[in-house]
Amino acid sequence: MDRRTLLISLASPAVLPSHSAVAGSAAELRQISYPVFGGQEDSFRHYCIEVLKLAVEHCGVGYQLKPVLQPVGQGRAIRQLSAGEGPLNILWSMTSAERERDLLPLRFPLDRGLMGWRLLLVRKAEQQRFAQIRSLEALRALTAVQMHDWPDTQILRANGLQVGTGSSYENLFAMLQHGRTDYFPRSVLEIAEDMARYGASHDLAIAPGLLLSYPTAFYFFVSPREPALAKDLSLGLERILSNGSWRALFLQQMRRQSKALKLHERQVLALRNPLLPAATPLQRTELWEEPGRLGA
């Protein structure tokens, strides 16, 4: 994935007209302030920004996009958004019942479900060890690593897997490198860039043959104090679903990478997700992707 093709400059706000003509100056436009999380600037993040941009262009209302330039951890950003404090009024994250209770979810899975398809980063010297693993029972003898405030931590533990946690994204790779944990589950949307950034320096590899899978969704979440913003963006998202521009953008991100990861050749270990809200629109098949189709 080429992040340069999707990058929106973080140096200044982007003023986006709606799909219909918007009168007035930028000063009259409503503002959408989104976070820049430290240490995780990747092309999936920029893809999410591009989806947000498309939704604004098609919602029929004028908005100004403004990045919050200081690093803000995910847990802190969610607390600020829920309380109506701080500069944010939107963020994107994996869903959970707790997050849908505290925030306004836009139930439009930005990841098309693929955030729950996880490959394993391991130490390069231990690839053969993981090549012998064919069951969850065998995997339970080892320890995964995740951020302390990621929903994935609870999901993995609910399936009987051991999880060590860290409070710094970069430190997770160091924990794996130095043997404090055994593997780092990363989504198929993230793992190629993780390898490009940390693989050589931390002596890591992608474990052969395995793929963990659990149902989940990665949404935009809006401040509960801004229901009008949630309504406007939901309309824009439905329009880019209908006109095909959203899936085209998604495939631009994923198709080449999916083929390289050989997803269709991997053994799938299915996990349950006790955090998945009942309102998740699993019945809307047009919102979801099957990884095996991406390399076609």
Regions found by a protein language model. Give the residues of each.
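N-terminal export signals
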Residues: 5-23
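Extracytoplasmic small-molecule ligand-binding "clamshell" domains
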Residues: 25-100, 233
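Periplasmic-binding protein-like
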Residues: 36, 114-119, 196-234, 256-278
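Bilobed "Venus flytrap"/periplasmic-binding protein-like clamshell domains
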Residues: 41-55, 120-160, 172, 189
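Extended ligand-binding regions for polar small-molecule ligands
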Residues: 53-58, 124-127, 215-257
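Acidic, polar ligand-binding/catalytic clefts
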Residues: 70-138
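A ligand-binding cleft/hinge motif common to bilobed small-molecule-binding domains
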Residues: 82, 90-102, 183-203
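An extracytoplasmic/periplasmic, membrane-proximal ligand-sensing/linker region
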Residues: 236-296
